[in-house]
Curated annotation (Swiss-Prot):
Family to which the UniProt record says this protein belongs: Belongs to the bacterial ribosomal protein bS18 family.
Residue ranges of coiled coil: none
Keyword rRNA-binding: yes
Entry protein name: Small ribosomal subunit protein bS18B
Function, as annotated: Binds as a heterodimer with protein bS6 to the central domain of the 16S rRNA, where it helps stabilize the platform of the 30S subunit.
The protein's assembly and partners: Part of the 30S ribosomal subunit. Forms a tight heterodimer with protein bS6.
Molecular function as annotated in GO: small ribosomal subunit rRNA binding; structural constituent of ribosome
Length: 87
């Protein structure tokens, strides 16, 4: 059995839209990541209670680590839920 000699075209490349880190930008310079600031931390948590990925949020490596640590501390102190209450 010989393979058919039809060649596939490569898919057109989609332009990659890079997001800037909010905390590194000028308007976020004076904003600190604190585990007690649940309103800020909720923006980085999915509906299921998981911490959103860095490629989704657009944060830099250092600030994504700080967000993860703050979320984990807030969960420990019961300021944020460990998981979503809906099933």
């Amino acid at each position: 059995m010989a393979k058919s000699s039809t060649k596939r075209r490569p898919a057109p490349e989609k332009p990659v839209k890079t997001r800037k880190c909010v905390f590194c930008s000028k308007k976020g310079k004076n904003q600190d990541i604190d585990y007690k600031d649940t309103q800020l931390l909720r923006t980085y948590i999915s509906e299921r209670g998981k911490i959103r990925a860095r490629r989704v949020t657009g944060n830099c490596v250092q600030h994504q680590r700080d967000i993860a640590i703050a979320v984990k501390n807030a969960r420990e102190v019961a300021l944020l839920p460990f998981s979503s209450s809906t099933r």
